[in-house]
Amino acid sequence: MKIETLSSLAKIYPDRDLDSKYFQKEGCMLQNEAFSFQAAFKLDDNDTQIKTAIGCKIDIPDELKPYTRVKAIDYVPCDYTLYPSSLALSDHPEPGLFPDILRDIPTIFWAYSNSWRGIFITVDAQNALLTPGTYTIKISFKQSRTYTKEFRIEVLEATLPKQSIPVTNWFHTDCLCNYYNVEFNSAEYWRITENFAKAAVHYGVNMLLMPVFTPPLDTAVGGERRTIQLIDVYKDGDKYSFGFKKLRKWVKMCKRAGVEYYEVSHLFTQWGCKYAPKVMATENGEYKRIFGWDTNGHGSEYLGFLEQLLPELITELKKLGIFKKCYFHVSDEPTAEMKGDYSICAKFLRQYVSPDRIFDALSDISFYKEGLISCPVVGLDHVHRFIEEKVPTIWGYYCCGHDMTSNRFLALPAGQNRMLGLQLYKFNIKGFLQWGFNFYNSHMSLEQIDPYGSSTGGGWVPGGDAFVVYPGADGNPVISIRLEVFREALQDMRALEALEAKYSAKMSKKKAHKEIISKLGLDEMTFLKFNCDGKYLVELREKINRLLTE
């Protein structure tokens, strides 16, 4: 039997040989972070068997044992890998099975003669403080005899600081209701939602989308997504009253999960504010929709409703102690043609919310120049225009259209996911957004999809764009390799911040930042020009760790 240990950035495909540049026998980590590596295995080339059942045993030192998780790597089909412009970047541009799902170790493990399989091992000490030293993890597979491989981890005497920026991956609880067949606001809804929220926070997603009304996102005009509405609305003519019991429950759940920032869902429809989101209300004892696609988003009826809601909502958020950690949306991804409508709605919202707490995904800098937004969330392919204009508060985002920037598509090299942390640090980006933590719908939410059967939203987007967790048994999330790597990117950013804090003891913060960029050879790196080679990124992180402890 063959066994190879590899970095977390390797891809163990069932129909490809291993890339030796990812082979890794040892690594180093800080005392309070997560460190992952992989072990791949297959039968010897001269083995006469096609496949055989094997035993798997991992010997873990006592110091690491409470924090070490071993998962079997499973595969998800991808029928739409990348756009033609980025196919050359991929080591598997064809449709096929892609390693992503991290399952519990099965009762029976199979080894094959013609296919590599693997396990993913994580020492997850982010809520601990490991004792510095060198530890050896021994991986054993038993066939007719036992085959072993060792991996050494050196824990260095240094720690990561707390994550400094808000990070959101949009959190779609209607998709959880659909998959698990539970009703909104049921006991099961809250249990499952909290499980997924805890997973989000654990992996660096410290801001959660808060559905005050059903988020008007990725919904066909005239269509509806399942109602998820935290505010109860009571209508009496043109007067409204509100109940915040569900909202309070949401905030308590978020606090238990460790959420730090709250992203109030969009108050106007996507792509330009033309309509109101779906709002359900009780009127004369009947629960019904009162606003939606047939409602002018900046007409007097809907704005009059918001004039009554927003003061009460803000008072409630202040009572809950979270208003200063709340961010508000107008409309997602408005274009220049929609600027007039966006202007009306943005100016309206600014009567109630400070401009620095209003943020939207957009890439047209004229919205900023004309004073319509102070906190733009910019597509990574457009960020440098905003940097050149010296915009003080820039967030970044990527989605299906960003294949030549950092992204997490299944068919892109894992390094293209991992390098994000270096870029966020170098360019002082204040926050990061991605649209799909767990979006299990098709294009425009016309259908529900099974994420285990389709990674592409039913063929709509490149595989991996719409979600980074899978719905597991008993309402628990199943983590993806891509989410593990995304967390590593955020840890890289935090390690650089720790190094900057160290250097700042002897020089200004600005000079320390410049010194680090130069010392690491990152002067030429931009959001569009980068080295995402996995071996390079692993070695670069080790260099950062050594600089921290020298």
Roles of regions detected by a PLM:
Residues 22-45, 209:
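Contiguous beta-strand segments within globular domains
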Residues 288-289, 359-383, 395-397:
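Aromatic- and acid-rich polysaccharide-binding/catalytic face
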Residues 21, 32-38, 128-138:
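Short, solvent-exposed loop/turn segments enriched in Ser/Thr/Gly
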Residues 32, 42-48, 126-128, 142-144:
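Short solvent-exposed strand-capping/beta-turn motif centered on an Asx-Ser/Thr pair
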Residues 90, 94, 123-125, 136-141, ...:
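Aromatic-lined carbohydrate-binding surfaces of glycoside hydrolases
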Residues 276, 294-302, 306-337, 348-362, ...:
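Catalytic domains of carbohydrate-active enzymes that cleave complex glycans
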Residues 375-457:
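Catalytic-core region of carbohydrate-active enzymes that cleave or remodel glycosidic bonds
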Residues 4-21, 45-121:
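Surface-exposed binding patches on compact interaction domains or structured appendages
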